[in-house]
C-alpha cells in the first residue's frame, strides 16, 4: 500500500496540472466502473449456485 501511494502521488500531480476537469472525469469513470464490476461479480457468485441447484432439480 505504501509503495503504491508513493508512485501514485507524482502521477496525480501531473494529471492535475494538465487539466483538472479531465482528471476528475477519469476518476469518476474509474470509480463507477469498479463499483459496477464488484456488484456484478457478487451477483454472479450468489446466482451461480442457485442456478445450478435449480437445473439439477428440474
Curated annotation (Swiss-Prot):
Molecular function in Gene Ontology: DNA binding
Function statement: Thought to be responsible for DNA condensation during packaging of the nucleocapsids.
One GO cellular component term noted in the UniProt record for this chain: viral nucleocapsid
Span list, region Disordered: 1-58
Record gene name: P7.3
Keyword entries, A-Z: DNA-binding, Late protein, Phosphoprotein, Repeat, Viral nucleoprotein, Virion
Taxonomic source organism: Cryptophlebia leucotreta granulosis virus (ClGV)
Location(s) in or outside the cell: Virion
Biased segments, Basic residues type: 1-19, 28-58
PTM entry text: Probably phosphorylated in infected cells.
Name under which the protein is recorded: DNA-binding protein
Amino acid at each position: 500500500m505504501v509503495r503504491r501511494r508513493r508512485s501514485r502521488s507524482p502521477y496525480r500531480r501531473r494529471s492535475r496540472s494538465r487539466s483538472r476537469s479531465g482528471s476528475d472525469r477519469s476518476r469518476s469513470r474509474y470509480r463507477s466502473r469498479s463499483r459496477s464490476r464488484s456488484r456484478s461479480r457478487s451477483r454472479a457468485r450468489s446466482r451461480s449456485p442457485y442456478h445450478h441447484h435449480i437445473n439439477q432439480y428440474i
